[in-house]
Amino acid sequence: MAHHATAGLPPPTPWQRLTRMLDTERSTIRYIIFYAVLTGLISLSLPLGTQAVFNLVSTGAVFSSTYILVAVVVGGVLLGGILLVGQMTLVEAIEQRIFAKAAIEYAYRLPRIKPEALEGEDPRELVNRFFDILTIQKGLTKLLVDVMFAVLQILMGVIVLSFYHPIFIGFGLFTILGLIGVYMLNYQRALRTSIEESAYKYELVAWLETVAGRLDEVRGDDKEEHKTLARADELTSEYLHARNAHFRILKSYYAYGIALRTILTAGLLIAGTLFVVSRQMTLGQFVAAEVLIVMISGSIEKLMTSINTIFDVLTAVEKVAVVTDLPMDEHKNSIAFDNA
């Protein structure tokens, strides 16, 4: 998890920091991805099973096979829930290990940081960045479970839709390219405003800590109390300004997501209806396609509403690195390894 600044090299990007942090968890993440793929495949049992049941019922052929199909669909939903619990368990294990490693790394690095690197800094205030580990923990559940499943569900839904009619391939490509374009369009601005928001948050906390450290001087002194409130009000205003700037960008993500969902849903519904009328699709396929459209639309919504969490995690990784990027005293470092 340590990130040493290397002379002549640019600092790692937030995504690079996050991947390095999760590098030791690769085997566990592979299992999470495997579970997500299985869950995604099982989720397809709903539209495909619905199509099969609809075809049987519409022809008046209600046999035991119909009940078997219903049981398969219900069983798929149950199995998907069990796999979700497995994913959550694996993510919880990753979160606990990240917390433990961060705590040990901070405890190891703090006494070994070069004194000149701390000039003008309050080490106690810098340590507050450790609490962003909690933000990373909470965000990983969304990233490794919700976001991953939403992405896989969109990909699988698009692939299945393409089998119903070649036109749906175009809709699928439009969806994937649209999502990538929407994400990249405001990425830099969203990340910058998120980091600015976090900086003001820590500045406010640092001021409150300063006040807490000199309560005897502040208490009962009208001038000091006014100064305390005025500075807190100023920092709060700056934080809210930065937060509003960040939220405006998030709203643009939500708006693009709504527009993408609307265009996709309208296009697929109109195309599907025309294909049924022209007998290029059966009614059962149309019903299954509608279920897939709802699933894809829901996944797009989940991705857009999770965008805030993505930037929170990237910002948190940057803030944790404020301490881990500080250069260490090589002499103390070598002594520690010699004594180990």
How should each PLM-predicted stretch be described?
Residues 26-27, 115-118, 128-140, 144, ...:
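An intracellular "coupling" helix at the cytosolic face of ABC transporter transmembrane type-1 domains
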Residues 56-71, 75, 160-174, 249-317:
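Helix-loop-helix
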Residues 80, 89-111, 115, 172-216, ...:
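Cytoplasmic coupling helices
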